[in-house]
Amino acid sequence: MRRLTALIAALALLATACGSDEGTTATLPDEGDTIILQTAYEGGFAPVEFILNQMPQHTLYADGRLVSQGPQPAIFPGPMLPSMQQVNIGDAAMAEVLAIVDDIGLPTTTDETNTEAAAVVADASDAVAYYYDETGTHRYAVYALGIVETADPHVAGMRSLFDTLDVLAVESPSAGEYVAERVQVLATQSFVDENEPGATLEPWPLAARPADLSEVADLGVSCTVLEGDEATAALTVFADADQMTFWDYEGVSYRILARPLFENEVGCEW
């Protein structure tokens, strides 16, 4: 309670000092395990299964925990699973982040995308920020963030938000190991040449058959969400796999992509 009171006071001082041209400020819920902010890179030119496997870049909880994708080893093939890290950013940094959220105007934005760069940049991704409060979800996106200079202060705020969260993810103290409770698994048939350097073929790792997975439209990709013991077992197997691991089911080879699901994500829905 003392921590929350101190943070609310700090936010009030920031709001008084900096103001907000939108007339409202970002707030924190009482429940510390509530997700208040997420950033992501969405879309872009990539195989469909990689687009479907995209996950939040940063996930910030009301209690100050920041979960993000950690550094990946500079090797190929790299690990199959994304590297996840969890830190605690502290009260001062939380106040700084929420001030940037105000600068972007997220508390009064429903769903807005800046596409200024689309005239000169093709096939780039959207940098997206999601802010969650008692009124719902607030989304602001910038196409090709950082590639094209713009005078829009909201775009500058987005660059500041991503940069600030990147720094906090590296410099803040650890909040313990991040453990996923649910996992999204994507599978697609894929030819494998076992003579290709690094390629390995392993037995199908899931209790469900490939045919039991949900088809994603007509994209040739199937999906399922694992929870509890199934998720734990799959993560254990996937931890020993890499980007060139393929999976055999009755003579048919598959490529599998997997990622953790956060509490506010359903999985297998697009």
Which residues are covered by each model-predicted region?
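Charged, amphipathic alpha-helical segments
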Residues: G90-A118
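Short, structured motif recognition centered on aromatic/hydrophobic residues
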Residues: H58, V97, V101, A129
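Sec-dependent signal peptide recognition
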Residues: R2-A10
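C-terminal motif of bacterial Sec signal peptides marking the signal peptidase cleavage site
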Residues: L14-A17
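A short, structured loop/turn motif at beta-sheet edges
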Residues: A62-D63, G90-M94, Y131-T137
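Generic detection of long, well-ordered alpha-helical segments
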Residues: V87, D91-M94, A151, V155
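Extracytoplasmic low-complexity, Pro/Thr/Ser/Ala/Gly-rich segments
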Residues: E22-N88
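Short, well-ordered, aromatic-rich surface patches in folded extracellular/luminal domains
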Residues: S20-A46, F50, P107-W270
